[in-house]
């Protein structure tokens, strides 16, 4: 999609069709932007290492960095960071933070980070020419505008047409029941107009579609099959992104601000509320120096298994999830979604885990879906290459691979559910789901793991 959009727009501007560049093994070095500088000896040493280290693009599209650079870990005030081909990542695991009356948690993301690097540094493949930047800027500006519009509407409490439709159904059901109860759901309809809901939906559509196009265009810089292939530019973007974040991390830590997490395009910090304006001024100064723009998101709590798997809860109750904590959708197979729901309800409102699980009567939330290579079999019944199951009290065993006979992982206690039933099953093993959710509490560091008992070796008889 991304390449097709860019090809069409470039043809409109230049009347030339794009040809794929020749692919050869190539060695290149990072080019340092003028604003980039560090203050500590540790980061200056790493900076020098990056500048002297060659990157190699192989003919199969793989990009390699030197072993010295790949193995380098950066330790700053108790947090460890690792550079990579794709982006910077902190190395935290099983840790949680909460905001309180004294301290706040703020996530600062760079607006359209990689696209901004491309535009700020004027990067384009030689085979395409500078017109690419014109096309790219139009796409980026449209997405940023839609994102700002969406944020403005969210602040007003707008949730979109799907939410409005849900409320209309609730009102209709209450009216049918002749209930004398007050309809709290009508308040939304009184405050938010239909046009605002439609604007919200339009902004989401533009944001999501252009995100796919823009990210896809960046990804094509590393694809040998694309007319956009330019591995040196891909590294220029990702290394600039990592070093720029390290610059800001260094400034935060030198100012006594604790960085609790960092990923490809953002940094999460925890600090005293009394210092918020001071920190905001520090970030504004950094924005002026680097020509990047940051967006702030405040959290009441952040609960991490690691940098790529976490739950973040905002003060208004909105929840951001990533990785294993994200509910199943078109991009991710469902896997006991009720456990994540129970965990989030516990973190947000203190709702007992078992209460959430037992109250749910949607069997889809108890289901795991998994691709089984070569097909799976359960109690002599062939299930096919995609297995769907829940955990029950009268399981007949495990699901096994047809070819090898080996057990499909995590199928102990399972009951296949290849067709969704009309009624909720009576044999759901609630205890399994409760224990699974309690394990998630250990994954995010809220509950200590039991100590590992080492087995003592019996002394051999002489």
Residue ranges of each PLM-predicted region?
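Charged, low-complexity surface segments at secondary-structure and domain boundaries
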Residues: 28-34, 122-130, 151-155, 189-199, ...
